[in-house]
Amino acid sequence: GRRVDPAALSGSLVITPTANPLGLDNRTKTAPQDLQDLDQTFPGNPQGMVTNHMAHALFQEVRAVASCLVNMHTMGSIHDSKPYCVYKVFPGSAVTEAQLLRMTSFFEPSVSCRMDVGGAGELPGNIA
């Protein structure tokens, strides 16, 4: 596998092995407590149900230290598939598509899917 050279970093690197432990433990995409998909609840809501609480807490922690988030996915009934990435391209962003792809390539995704997001409901910034 690839290794990160701390001397080559020009920022912070935060790695969370799993963002959705409730779904992982249940072997589903959704949390059994509220049947919500964590990926679809970002940035979360501290007044919402348990999945919204998790999304809010995680998003606030990452947002405080990151200019870009690499969000890898897997799927399959036992989460045994190859990782993939959906990357978001925002109009006027300081982070280029080439930079996003370079960041995701470190994780060797089986596929990277581009998503143009300029709608009013999307958060500003880059999420890969």
Where are these predicted regions, by residue range?
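Structured catalytic-domain cores with a bias toward divalent-metal coordination
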Residues: 1-128
